[in-house]
Regions:
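The feature captures two recurrent sequence modes
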Residues: 1-143
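Generic structural signal of hydrophobic/aromatic residues within well-ordered alpha-helices
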Residues: 66, 70, 107-110, 114, ...
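Amphipathic alpha-helical interface segments within eukaryotic helical scaffold
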Residues: 108-185, 191-195, 200
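Charged/polar positions within long, soluble alpha-helices
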Residues: 165, 199-207, 227-237
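Domain-level detector for trafficking modules
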Residues: 182-190, 199, 205-221
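Eukaryote-biased recognition of C-terminal alpha-helical segments
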Residues: 214-253
Length: 253
């Protein structure tokens, strides 16, 4: 718990102006034709059985089944709202944990596609708009510091991987329970920080996303995070920053 608190980032916020109005325009490009399948891009099935066709109340019993549900439900138009719902009889913490890893892989892939455009020279600070700068606690016990966006994302991805590898946070053995505070003190900080990468991409690299024809993938992935967070009350309104209006648009679809 102490280590978790020491690693807590601080969001430096100045007076909020009108960055949401620009963000809403992103919604009109890519998502309106229906979602492109978004999956855990580093995931390879370990056996050769047909994918589960999930429906409301599908009963699952393993990490493998959970991952298959996440993947297959995203492949059909209009099912994101259903895809985030907890399958019947499944452990809520395990369901959230699987999605944390999947969202990590999605944003890792998306950011990886624009790294040549995001450098210490082009993005000397990790910001969404000028009103929102995200700081990182490089040295525990000392104030968080401003970093170039690529360095911030590098620290973030390594930190996430450390969380996933920690058996105290993400137990991998059957029957080992998740911490009682898993959703609020472990999952929420992970999703909150990953959300900041979406914010940086939307506010500073959306033109590159358009050039790469990845706008549908980005919008679908982002909407998936928003719907999942809303379903399980993970992120709070102030976590959305300059993308609050865009989040509202996606939720209402």
């Amino acid at each position: 718990m102490q280590q978790q608190q020491q690693q807590q980032q601080h969001l430096h916020q100045q007076q909020f102006s009108t960055p949401q109005k620009q963000a809403t325009n992103f919604f009109q490009q890519g998502i309106e034709h229906g979602p492109t399948p978004v999956t855990d891009f580093n995931y390879t099935p370990s056996h050769q059985r047909p994918y589960i066709q999930p429906t409301s109340g599908t009963v699952v019993s393993s990490h493998q089944d959970l991952r298959q549900i996440v993947e297959t439900t995203l492949g059909s138009k209009g099912v994101l709202n259903q895809a985030v719902k907890l399958p019947k009889g499944e452990n809520i913490d395990e369901w959230i944990a699987v999605h944390c890893v999947d969202f990590y892989n999605q944003i890792n892939m998306l950011y990886g596609s624009i790294t040549e455009f995001c450098s210490p020279q082009t993005c000397p600070r990790m910001i969404a708009t000028n009103e929102y700068e995200y700081l990182w606690n490089v040295h525990p016990g000392k104030p968080p510091v401003s970093l170039p966006a690529p360095k911030y994302v590098d620290y973030l991805m390594k930190w996430c991987q450390q969380q996933f590898d920690d058996e105290n946070y993400f137990p991998s053995k059957p029957g080992v329970p998740f911490p009682k505070d898993f959703k609020d003190n472990i999952a929420r900080p992970i999703l909150k920080r990953l959300f900041r990468v979406y914010a940086h991409i939307y506010c500073h690299h959306f033109n590159e996303i358009l050039e790469l024809n990845l706008q549908t993938v980005l919008n679908t992935s982002f909407r998936h995070v928003c719907l999942f967070s809303e379903e399980f009350h993970i992120l709070k309104t102030n976590d959305y920053g300059p993308l609050l209006e865009l989040v509202t648009e996606f939720k209402d679809r």
